[in-house]
């Protein structure tokens, strides 16, 4: 596939450009033996470990792992249930909580050996994780919290696996959208919900800031598909630390991230679904093979792809990517590289803002998480010049804060 430059200049006027070439959850019953058996399953080591916050299947009890005891505890209900449910959902990588409720420990059968956590409500306003504000307790109110999070990162259609550099198929990447200015595809983006898209800041230079001329296309893999759903743009919130917007001569692409608020909400279907964010504290794993997609150029000087392209590429450590043979200390802490040392498969012009997604099972079921945003690179698919991505895990709080702060905003908005 191909990459659009992480700059405001035309994609071929400078060397740096961006784009894509060529388990079981704990179900508390109050019966000690049953609880212990389920905890044993949860802590099995043959798969990647479950994340430390979970929702139980069936009744969506909010569970937090007590690492000291090796057990899962329920969260006692409080006056701040809405905030606690929202914080729990966000921590797991969901965009928001859709609902919450209480269950009574005496009737729901959850007063077993696993125990409970209580919330320090005074610490909630500044908390970024549940573990910051909980402590073991006896649940004096006798009621505990359940939560419903906005679903994400799951395909609604069975799809075949494709191994890199090929046409994609409808429904494989239902969170991928096309951002078009005056009808021309300029960047990709990722749906976080029906009305929010995450993309790259460099997609919105001064010359492309008339929002009425932007349209977002979703639900299709063919760039010219008449069946795509399209919506207008209400606002673009870009990171205030993206320095080229302050001074176009600055050759520094940190904080290359922006949110697009749609004029209305897209209908969620088999072909339109949101992607998950990384869970709080979730680390990128060097060497892990993930997927980058886009409609960008299939060669550096080639044409844009007609059908959405996808490629599987491994994450490269920043140590390697900052070596003299690669990018020589140009990879900053909030960036990462992915690709092959020999080149051949990469992002390219037109893929900018698109997603780098990784699959995991830390929530007990398979989900795709948005780990990177196509940002920049040198050429396309060149040896030792892999694609460079914005590291989404480092912008989780920026994303949540921007959505909460600017949900009613219009036009171009800066979020520090």
Swiss-Prot record:
Its main location: membrane. The keyword Acetylation does not apply. It is a single-pass type II membrane protein. Glycans are attached at residue 111. Belongs to the peptidase S1 family. GO terms for cellular component: apical plasma membrane; cell surface; cell-cell junction; cytoplasm; endoplasmic reticulum membrane; membrane; neuronal cell body; nuclear membrane. It catalyses: Cleavage after basic amino-acid residues, with Arg strongly preferred to Lys. Gene3D superfamilies: SRCR-like domain, Trypsin-like serine proteases. The active site is at 202 (charge relay system), 256 (charge relay system), 352 (charge relay system). The keyword Repeat does not apply. Residues 40-416 are extracellular. Disulfide bonds join 76-139, 89-149, 118-137, 152-276, 187-203, 290-358, 321-337, 348-380. It holds the Pfam family Hepsin-SRCR. Residues 1-18 are cytoplasmic. It comes from Rattus norvegicus. The gene is Hpn. InterPro entries: Hepsin-SRCR_dom, Peptidase_S1_PA, Peptidase_S1_PA_chymotrypsin, Peptidase_S1A, SRCR, SRCR-like_dom_sf, Trypsin_dom, TRYPSIN_HIS. Widely expressed. Present in brain, heart, kidney, liver, stomach, muscle, lung, testis, skin and eye. Not expressed in ovary and thynus. In inner ear tissues, expressed in stria vascularis, modiolus, organ of Corti and spiral ganglion. It comes from the Eukaryota. Keywords: Cell membrane, Disulfide bond, Glycoprotein, Hydrolase, Membrane, Protease, Serine protease, Signal-anchor, Transmembrane, Transmembrane helix. Serine protease that cleaves extracellular substrates, and contributes to the proteolytic processing of growth factors, such as HGF and MST1/HGFL. Plays a role in cell growth and maintenance of cell morphology. Plays a role in the proteolytic processing of ACE2. Mediates the proteolytic cleavage of urinary UMOD that is required for UMOD polymerization. One of its GO terms (biological process) is positive regulation of cell growth. Residues 162-404 form the Peptidase S1 domain. Its EC number is 3.4.21.106. This is Serine protease hepsin. The chain crosses the membrane at residues 19-39. Residues 53-150 form the SRCR domain. It is found in: Cell membrane; Apical cell membrane.
């Amino acid at each position: 596939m191909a990459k659009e430059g992480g700059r405001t200049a035309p994609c071929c006027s400078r060397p740096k450009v961006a784009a894509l070439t060529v388990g079981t959850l704990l179900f508390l019953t109050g019966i000690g033996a049953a609880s212990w058996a389920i905890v044993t399953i949860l802590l099995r080591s043959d798969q990647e470990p479950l994340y430390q916050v979970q929702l139980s299947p069936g009744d969506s009890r909010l569970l937090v792992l007590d690492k000291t005891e090796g057990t899962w505890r329920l969260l006692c209900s409080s006056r701040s249930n809405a905030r606690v449910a929202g914080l729990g959902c966000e921590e797991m990588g969901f965009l928001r909580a859709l609902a919450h409720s209480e269950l009574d420990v005496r009737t729901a059968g959850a007063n077993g050996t696993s125990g409970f956590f209580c919330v320090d409500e005074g610490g909630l306003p500044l908390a970024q994780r549940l573990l910051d504000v909980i402590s073991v307790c006896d649940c004096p109110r006798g009621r505990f919290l359940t939560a419903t999070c906005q679903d994400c990162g799951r395909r609604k259609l069975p799809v075949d696996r494709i191994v890199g550099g090929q046409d994609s198929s409808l429904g494989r990447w239902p969170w991928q959208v096309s951002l078009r200015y005056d009808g021309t595809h300029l960047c990709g983006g990722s749906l976080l919900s029906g009305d929010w898209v995450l993309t790259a800041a460099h997609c919105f230079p001064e010359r492309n800031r008339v929002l009425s001329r932007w349209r977002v296309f979703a639900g299709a893999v063919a760039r010219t598909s008449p069946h795509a759903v399209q919506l207008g743009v209400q606002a673009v919130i870009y990171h205030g630390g993206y320095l080229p917007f302050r001074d176009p001569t600055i050759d520094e692409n940190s904080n290359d991230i922006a949110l697009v608020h749609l004029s209305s909400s897209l209908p969620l279907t088999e072909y339109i679904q949101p992607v998950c964010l990384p869970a709080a504290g979730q680390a990128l794993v060097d060497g892990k093979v993930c997927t980058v997609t886009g409609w960008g150029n299939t060669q550096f000087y080639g044409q844009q792809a007609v059908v959405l392209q996808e490629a599987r590429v491994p994450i490269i450590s920043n140590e390697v990517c900052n070596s003299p043979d690669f990018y020589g200390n140009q990879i900053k802490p909030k960036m990462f590289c992915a690709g092959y040392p020999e080149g051949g498969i990469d992002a390219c012009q037109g893929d900018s803002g698109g997603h780098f997604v990784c699959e995991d099972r830390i929530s007990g079921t398979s989900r795709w998480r948005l780990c990177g945003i196509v940002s920049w690179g040198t050429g396309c698919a060149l040896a030792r010049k892999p694609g460079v991505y914005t590291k989404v895990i480092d912008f989780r709080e920026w994303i949540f804060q921007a959505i909460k702060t600017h949900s009613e905003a219009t036009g171009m908005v800066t979020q520090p």
